[in-house]
Amino acid sequence: MAFLPKFDAGGLVTCVTTDAATGDVLMVAHMNDEALRRTVATGEAWYFSRSRNALWRKGESSGQTQRVIEMRTDCDQDAVWLRVEQTGAACHTGRRSCFYRRVERTEADGGARLVFVDADRLFDPDAVYRK
C-alpha cells in the first residue's frame, strides 16, 4: 500500500509530534510535500512554517533536534504523527512542549483560564533566536 498524503488547499498536512519515550505531545505543526520527503529521507523532522512560508528542519536555529523513531498517517492520509527522540526543547518558547498551559474552567463565571504546567524553560529564546 502506498503512502499518498492528501494535502489541503494550501498544500499542507497537519503533523502531531510526540516524545517516543513518554508519549507526551510536543507540538503540532504542518508539513508540505518537501518536508515529508526530507523527513522520510533523513530521519530528522522537517516542517513547513505558514508564517514564514518556508521549509525548516527542527533544530536548525536552536539545536533542539528531533530524530524520527516512527511516522504514522491517519485513515484519510491527511495528517501525520511523528514519534521522535527530542533533544532539548520542542517549543520555540524554550519549553519542552508547546502544550505547557492547561485550560481550566473558572467556577465563578463558567469561563476558562490558563494555568502554567511544565513551563520551565530549557533555553532562552531571546538568546537563541536573536537576529
From Swiss-Prot:
Known Pfam families for this protein?
PRA-CH (PF01502)
- Enzyme Commission code(s) on record: 3.5.4.19
Arranged from A to Z, the UniProt key words for this protein are: Amino-acid biosynthesis, Cytoplasm, Histidine biosynthesis, Hydrolase, Magnesium, Metal-binding, Zinc
- Where does this protein chiefly localize? cytoplasm
* Positions annotated to bind Zn(2+): 75, 91, 98
Cofactor binding notes: Binds 1 Mg(2+) ion per subunit. Binds 1 zinc ion per subunit.
Name one molecular function that GO assigns to this entry: magnesium ion binding
Instruction: Specify which residues bind Mg(2+) according to the UniProt entry for this protein.
Output: 74, 76, 78
Catalysed reaction(s) here are: 1-(5-phospho-beta-D-ribosyl)-5'-AMP + H2O = 1-(5-phospho-beta-D-ribosyl)-5-[(5-phospho-beta-D-ribosylamino)methylideneamino]imidazole-4-carboxamide
Q: In which pathway does it act?
A: Amino-acid biosynthesis; L-histidine biosynthesis; L-histidine from 5-phospho-alpha-D-ribose 1-diphosphate: step 3/9
* Single GO biological process annotation from the record: L-histidine biosynthetic process
Q: What class of enzyme is it?
A: hydrolase
Compartments it resides in: Cytoplasm
Show the GO cellular component annotation of the record: cytoplasm
CC cofactor: Mg(2+); Zn(2+)
Q: Which domain of life is it from?
A: Bacteria
Record's keyword annotation contains Amino-acid biosynthesis: yes
**PANTHER family recorded:** HISTIDINE BIOSYNTHESIS BIFUNCTIONAL PROTEIN, HISTIDINE BIOSYNTHESIS BIFUNCTIONAL PROTEIN HIS7
**Protein family according to the UniProt entry:** Belongs to the PRA-CH family.
Tell me how this protein assembles. Homodimer.
Q: What function does the entry list?
A: Catalyzes the hydrolysis of the adenine ring of phosphoribosyl-AMP.
Official protein name in the record: Phosphoribosyl-AMP cyclohydrolase
Q: What gene name is given for the protein in this entry?
A: hisI
